């Protein structure tokens, strides 16, 4: 890390420790005398620790490699993957596996990283899932990069930005669609920040499989294409090309469609509403904090419930349209009931 210390000294806030799992030979010797075959797993974590042991709590480390102890790395992401529907499914499996390994903050590359550009629909569905994930990011190898052999006959156009995808497919209106999802992400930041605080306080992954919270429900034991995002949201990404609806399992309790506010009873399978933008459901008795049009809003789901808003240091209890707020906040908050 000493080679990079000058960057911290001039105010760099964080580092992305790409790679970290590469060794050139099983027979190579590490400095402690172990061979490549013996030390290749530990090397991954040593590579990351060289930075994480030196940076301050205010700095961030974004890594892809890890071994035993990876749960202590600030942020991990899924690494380079191709732009296919199967890879998107694998990315979600990786996220849920990471959560069960104690990894709190996790990310992936919207639309994939390598190979031919994703279809418009794959990019859309990948973006939707990223909105409801701990870290939202897109990036890719540069045009004609190291994975160009995956693109025989291609012109090398590989940039995964929304505007390049729109340009490549001749669909300028796609930019407005992407602006909607990126704006929604910005509006959800208060809820995401709250979820991150809970993750740190309780060692509870932000994005996690349903079995993490509903361990007595046999229907969720092997469920690998839905997840919880924080304590309030259940997300069921659309995984197939041009898919607009899917089967969704809702655990015990009442659940509200995040986009339409329609209420569903839990402990059953439902068909998601094809008119909704994405199958996302909010658990009754919980809250969602958002910032819309510059206004701080807290949405109260269900006929009664309670929640603590950590950023404002207030406790909320409601029954019907009667609400009790304990604590003081300098924020002007608008409460909205979803019943």
Feature map (PLM): residue ranges:
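Catalytic-domain carbohydrate-binding cleft regions of carbohydrate-active enzymes
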Residues: 1-277
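Accessory, solvent-exposed terminal regions and/or long lumenal/extracellular loops of proteins
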Residues: 277-339
């Amino acid at each position: 890390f000493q080679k990079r210390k000058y960057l911290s000294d001039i105010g760099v806030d964080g580092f992305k420790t790409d790679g970290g799992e590469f060794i050139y030979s099983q027979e190579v010797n590490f400095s402690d005398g172990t061979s490549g075959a013996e030390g290749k797993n530990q090397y991954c974590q040593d590579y990351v620790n060289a930075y994480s042991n030196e940076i301050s709590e205010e700095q961030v480390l974004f890594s892809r490699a890890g071994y035993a102890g990876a749960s202590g790395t600030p942020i991990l992401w899924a690494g380079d993957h191709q732009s296919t529907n199967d890879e998107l499914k694998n990315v979600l499996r990786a996220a849920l596996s990471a959560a069960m390994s104690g990894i709190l903050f996790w990310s992936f590359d919207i639309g994939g990283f390598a190979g031919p550009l994703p279809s418009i629909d794959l990019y859309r569905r990948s973006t939707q899932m990223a909105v409801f994930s701990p870290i939202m990011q897109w990036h890719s190898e540069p045009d004609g990069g190291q994975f160009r052999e995956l693109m025989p006959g291609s012109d090398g156009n590989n940039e995964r930005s929304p505007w390049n995808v729109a340009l490549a497919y001749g669909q300028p209106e796609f930019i407005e669609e992407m602006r909607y999802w990126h704006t929604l992400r910005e509006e959800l930041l208060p809820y995401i920040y709250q979820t991150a605080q809970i993750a740190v306080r309780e060692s509870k992954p932000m994005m996690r499989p349903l079995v993490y919270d509903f361990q007595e429900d046999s229907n969720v034991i092997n469920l690998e294409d839905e997840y919880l995002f924080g304590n309030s949201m259940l997300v069921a990404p659309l995984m197939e090309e041009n898919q607009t609806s899917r089967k969704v399992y809702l655990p015990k309790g009442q659940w509200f469609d995040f986009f339409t506010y329609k209420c569903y009873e839990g402990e059953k399978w439902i068909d998601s509403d094809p008119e909704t933008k994405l199958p996302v459901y909010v658990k009754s008795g919980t809250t969602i904090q958002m910032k819309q049009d510059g206004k701080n809003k807290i949405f109260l789901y269900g006929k009664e419930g309670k929640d603590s808003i950590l950023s404002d240091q207030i406790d909320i209890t409601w029954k019907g349209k009667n609400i009790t707020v304990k604590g003081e906040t300098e924020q002007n908050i608008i409460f909205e009931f979803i019943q």
